[in-house]
Regions:
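Extracytoplasmic/secreted envelope proteins and their assembly/folding machinery
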Residues: 29, 33-37, 70, 127, ...
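N-terminal lobe/hinge region of extracytoplasmic solute-binding protein
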Residues: 1-8, 15, 112
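Local pocket/hinge segments that shape ligand/substrate recognition
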Residues: 141, 171-193
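Gly/Pro-rich hinge or "lid" segments in bacterial periplasmic/extracellular proteins
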Residues: 64, 68-70, 78-79, 84-146, ...
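Short helices/loops that flank or line small-molecule/ion binding pockets
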Residues: 24-26, 31, 156-166, 183-184
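Sec-exported extracytoplasmic/periplasmic mature domains
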Residues: 37-45, 97, 135, 163, ...
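Surface-exposed binding/hinge segments that line
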Residues: 11-15, 26-33, 38-104
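Structural recognition of the beta-strand scaffold that forms the well-ordered cores
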Residues: 12-14, 129, 148-151, 168-172, ...
Length: 193
């Protein structure tokens, strides 16, 4: 990272030379810019958009006062991403770890991923089918090649499938059965932060 003397201009070398989307297209600095533009777009609902207001002119763009080209984020090259901030902030590097800074593809929103799996099939109200991303580096050998998320609206039906081993994960159990599941060591709780 290169930082200006006023701590307002940051140039990041995107160390993603070999990272590819699930369709084989290389990830570039422009994909990060596209993500920020989408989040700042006034028609995009976002609970985290205020965090982007540290970037020069981001709020003015969100308020439709200026074009996106005036916002302090740009791709200097395929591998260089520049941010210009309104003022120096010590926590800027931490903000970059938030999902609003993850890369996105304008031409294929929601259809490609850089993660270990991609959405192969979605049957509304029935299931999601995730498949191994063939371009994901270091995919664990023991990891499943496919993951199926079944949507089962009735809690009691889902519980029966779980008890008989036909479901590996149960995200919601009837309260009356919770103690039994806890005694068997089948309950794990992960608080949301």
């Amino acid at each position: 990272v290169s930082v200006s003397s006023q701590n307002k201009r940051f140039i990041y070398k995107v160390l993603l030379k070999k990272v590819q989307w699930s369709d084989g297209v290389a990830v570039t600095a422009q994909h990060f810019v596209d993500s920020i533009e989408r989040t700042l777009n006034p028609s995009t609902p976002s609970k985290l958009v205020d965090l982007l207001y540290v970037i020069e002119n981001a709020k003015a763009y969100r308020e439709k006062k200026i074009p996106f080209s005036s916002v302090g984020v740009s791709a200097k090259s395929d591998l260089e991403l520049e941010f210009i901030l309104n003022k120096p902030i010590s926590y800027f590097a931490h903000l970059l770890a938030l999902p609003i800074f993850y890369p996105q593809r304008k031409e294929a929103p929601g259809k490609v991923t850089t993660g270990p799996y991609f959405l192969k099939e979605w049957k509304i109200g029935e299931k999601f089918l995730l498949e191994k991303n063939p371009y994901y580096k270091d995919f664990p050998e023991q990891a499943p090649k496919q993951i199926v998320f079944q949507i089962i609206p009735e809690e009691i039906t889902a519980l029966q499938l779980f008890k008989t081993g036909k479901l590996q994960i149960l995200t919601k159990a009837p309260y009356t059965d919770l103690q039994e599941l806890q005694k068997k060591g089948l309950v794990r709780s992960f608080p949301f932060r």
